Amino acid sequence: MAKNLTPSDAKLEITQIKGVIGAKQNQKATLRSLGLKRIGHTVVRNADAVTVGMLNTVPHLVNVEEAK
């Protein structure tokens, strides 16, 4: 999951693993800001401070891996 993330020059593969029904409004907005629209959707983002902060807001809704 998205635990112990720190900003770096790496790329992250972020996959939404749970839906947003019942999630708080700020969590829904965070997922949309990351570019995630549905369960199973994957995006690749830089591991900068902004992205890491967003991922720390929704660690229970996403799966994060380092992109190859």
From Swiss-Prot:
Biological source species: Paenarthrobacter aurescens (strain TC1)
Name the InterPro entries for this protein. Answer: Ribo_uL30_ferredoxin-like_sf, Ribosomal_uL30_bac-type, Ribosomal_uL30_CS, Ribosomal_uL30_ferredoxin-like
Binding partners and assembly: Part of the 50S ribosomal subunit.
| GO function term, MF aspect, one | structural constituent of ribosome
Annotated family? Belongs to the universal ribosomal protein uL30 family.
| UniProt keyword list | Ribonucleoprotein, Ribosomal protein
Would you kindly state one Gene Ontology biological process term found in this protein's UniProt entry?
Answer: translation
- Which residues span the membrane? none
Superkingdom of source: Bacteria
Taxonomic placement: Bacteria, Bacillati, Actinomycetota, Actinomycetes, Micrococcales
Family matches, as SUPFAM superfamilies? Ribosomal protein L30p/L7e
> What's the protein name?
Large ribosomal subunit protein uL30
Is Ribonucleoprotein given among the entry's keywords? yes
Q: Which gene codes for it?
A: rpmD
Q: Does the keyword Coiled coil apply?
A: no
One Pfam entry for this protein is Ribosomal_L30
